[in-house]
């Protein structure tokens, strides 16, 4: 059967023969996929891996909101490798387990998804994700997603998987560069007279041109407005980056130099976490929005959570920097007071 899943630990190349079907594995670059099917709609595809957590984070961007929403709903329903999925407009962020995970895949139904992520594997400095889609969802995985900027190549088990549309089933392995996730929290770069931490943080992110570093997003994190020592609104900033192997040190040196050279405060704090998920949720999430904390509190919790500080001051900015980092991937509620939702 040409549509049986291929083990993710199989070495695949242009001359690979699928033992189950006798078909040659067909490998196409994004340009070749585009030439075959015409330009479609995927705008970005990127995969970060956290080996310690056994997770991958997949970022996908499409020109249309409807396709992102339908794909997300069906991938979650199919289960497979997906642990969770979050949609913001035309962008999707998926958390997925590493390894092969059987999916409830087929024509969309009560417990069946018309599109599925069946596996995620790291091979050297690349990540291989295995996808299935039926009918229009097959067009998505076989013709649209493989064109996305960020894809290295697509591997199809057979010619049948390149026959898209109608009621056909398509399967594909999408290969992309391996990234890790780096989250950076920044606070106390300004004073009551001048400066704005969010402006400096965003300028830092957008000015980064290090090869192998991809700026993902930033969040403003509301800290406790009742603290006595603050500029005005008491807001920290968090930056998220996808980073290729061997590029983390260059990124951290760049961020520290940019932020500290642009800061007008002597209290600046910069906190860093490498990874997609923490081993446990930190009580500091609530405390930094509701209590008055000390630098010792922040440093102790950072050490416990695997967070390190790279600032040169060692002063009170570390409190908000850690808070911003911990909230940096929590969603829009990061911008509100504790318990406040939009």
Model-found features: residue ranges?
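N-terminal amphipathic/basic-hydrophobic helices that include classical n-h-c signal peptides
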Residues: 1-24
